[in-house]
Amino acid sequence: MSDLNFNNPKGSPLLYLREDKVKESLNTFFNVSKNFEKIITDKINNDIFGIADIRCLLIINLNPGIIFNELMEELDISKQSLNRVLKKLIHNNFIIQKINSEDARKKNLYLSNQTNKMLDNILEPILNDISEAFQKSGSNSVQGFNQIINNILKRKKNDS
């Protein structure tokens, strides 16, 4: 197995950056994603919600008052796809739209109280799993993990 082109200050390859170790990490990301998706799909009514809907609701939950273009950018989906998701969620009263106080052409998006409670219920097992893993790992590991994730996401944004 080859090493990726990273060396520590002394010039020798960093063992955790061997290609096989990086591939193992990638496989772990895939497995975690699959497990989280399964937990969510087991808890939702698939006639109403899909993973895209839950992700949309989560982003609005984290950013109350977010506007359409910001949500579209965060989800990295087309205008047409987001319109389809939002139309359904607004029609079923999961999302509340309010006219933006600074620009009447824009609408701020919020979750209803019922939707916030439902989302908390759906995500509770995942949040508990993540919290438990963070507690077992210690603060340095949590900071390192978050730094890795943020570096991956920043690189993706820079490549776009």
Question: Which residues does each PLM region occupy?
Answer:
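N-terminal leader segment of winged-helix/HTH proteins
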Residues: 1-47, 94, 111
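N-terminal helix-turn-helix DNA-binding core of bacterial DNA-binding proteins
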Residues: 37-78
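Alpha-helical linker/hinge and terminal dimerization helices associated
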Residues: 29-40, 75, 115-137, 152-159
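Generic structural concept
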Residues: 26, 30, 57, 112, ...
